[in-house]
Amino acid sequence: MQLTMSSSKMKSLLKGLRYISQVFESEKEEEIQIGNPTDVKHVAHIGWDGPSANATAPSWMTEFNSGGGFESAEGVGEDDSSIKCMSEYGGRSRDLPNLPKSTRKAASEKGSPTKDKSSDKTKRRSSNKGTSSSSRRPKEATEEQDELSSWPSGLPEIPKKSRRKKKSTKETAVNGGSSRSTRRSDVDNMSEYMSETGSVRSMPQFDNRDDF
């Protein structure tokens, strides 16, 4: 009996769970159905695939007015002297003559009054600099000459070396050499005399001395 009661309870619980699960599944949102990838066409290809592409295109694509998106360039090849430049943001076209870059720059510089004024100012400055430098140069030269002329007067005079000093030094050198030569000759004479006699007392220089 207990087993039958427990099995009946389990069955009732399972039925309740199934019912709850079915309720939640029914409440789910319906999924959006998307067609095959071949049915979708890129926006950039509109009008390039012919009338068949427009026929198969959806309604929101056909409602799009493409007027003004592209400009017809039929008259571009006729006038070679003008080039249409489309700006990236404003979409405005400006007609410019077909000229080389150097001539365009020259024309723009001639037409601008600010550049003319700046060129005049630079010319004036250069002329003023040239005149000021030319006027300063002679002034600087005269100032340098005055400084050179006043330079020796401010310093004490240095006495010139006399030639007599040089002569005296030469004479002393000669006398010193002669005195040395005489001393050497005396020593040589004494040594020779001693070798001959064997004593110093017999020399006439030491005859009057009592020390020996």
UniProtKB/Swiss-Prot annotation:
UniProt keyword list: Cell membrane, Growth regulation, Membrane
Biased composition (Basic and acidic residues): 106-121
Record's GO cellular component terms: apical plasma membrane
Cellular localization per UniProt: Cell membrane
Domain CRIB: 34-47
Main location, first listed in the record: membrane
Annotated membrane topology: Peripheral membrane protein
Compositional bias (Polar residues): 53-65, 192-202
Pfam families named in the record: PBD (PF00786)
Region (Disordered): 51-212
Functional summary from the UniProt entry: Functions as a downstream effector of Rho-related GTP binding proteins of the 'Rho of Plants' (ROPs) family. Participates in the propagation of ROP GTPase signals in specific cellular responses. Is involved in pollen tube growth regulation through its interaction with ARAC11/ROP1.
PANTHER family: CRIB DOMAIN-CONTAINING PROTEIN RIC6-RELATED, CRIB DOMAIN-CONTAINING PROTEIN RIC8
Protein known as: CRIB domain-containing protein RIC6
Gene this protein is translated from: RIC6
